[in-house]
Design a protein with these regions (language model features):
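General nucleic-acid-binding
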Residues: 1-27
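Short alpha-helix boundary/capping elements
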Residues: 32, 44-45, 60-63, 88
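Short, Lys/Arg-enriched anionic-surface-contact patches
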Residues: 33-52
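Short, amphipathic alpha-helical "recognition" segments used to contact nucleic acids or chromatin
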Residues: 49-64
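Short alpha-helical "recognition helix" segments of helix-turn-helix
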Residues: 68-74
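Helix-turn-helix DNA-binding helix
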Residues: 79-80
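DNA major-groove recognition helix of helix-turn-helix
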Residues: 84-87, 91
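Intrinsically disordered, low-complexity basic tails/linkers immediately adjacent to helix-turn-helix/homeobox/MYB/SANT
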Residues: 93, 97-106
Length: 106
C-alpha cells in the first residue's frame, strides 16, 4: 500500500489551487487582500509569508549579507537561504516576477 495520491485526488488538488488563484485575482484593494488572507491563513502563516517577502526584497537589494538579512527580517538563516535559492534558481520565478513588476511600478 502506498501513500501516492490517486489521479482523481491530484485533479481535485489542482482544481482547488486554480480556484484559489481565481479568488486572489478577484481582489481589488489592499483591504480586500487583507480581509481574505486574514480569513484564509492563521496569524503565523501570514507572518511567515510576510517574513519571506521581506527576505526576498532585501536579497534583491544585494546590499547585505545573508546573516544581516536574517537579522533585519527576523528570519532564520535557513529561510534566507531558501528564499535566495527560489529567487535565483527555481523555474517558477514568482519572487522575481513580482519584484521586477513592483520596481517598474515605483
Amino acid at each position: 500500500m502506498t501513500d501516492t495520491p490517486s489521479p482523481k485526488a491530484l485533479n481535485k488538488a489542482a482544481d482547488d489551487r486554480i480556484a484559489l488563484y481565481e479568488a486572489l485575482l478577484s481582489l481589488r484593494t489592499r483591504e480586500e487582500v487583507d480581509a481574505f488572507l486574514s480569513d484564509l491563513c492563521t496569524p503565523s502563516e501570514l507572518r511567515a509569508f510576510a517574513e519571506r517577502w521581506a527576505v526576498a526584497r532585501l536579497l534583491d537589494q544585494q546590499a547585505q549579507s545573508y546573516r544581516e538579512i536574517a537579522l533585519a527580517a527576523g528570519a532564520s538563516p535557513t529561510t534566507v537561504v531558501r528564499v535566495a535559492r527560489f529567487l535565483k534558481d527555481m523555474q517558477h520565478q514568482g519572487y522575481r516576477l513580482v519584484l521586477d513588476r513592483l520596481k517598474t511600478k515605483a
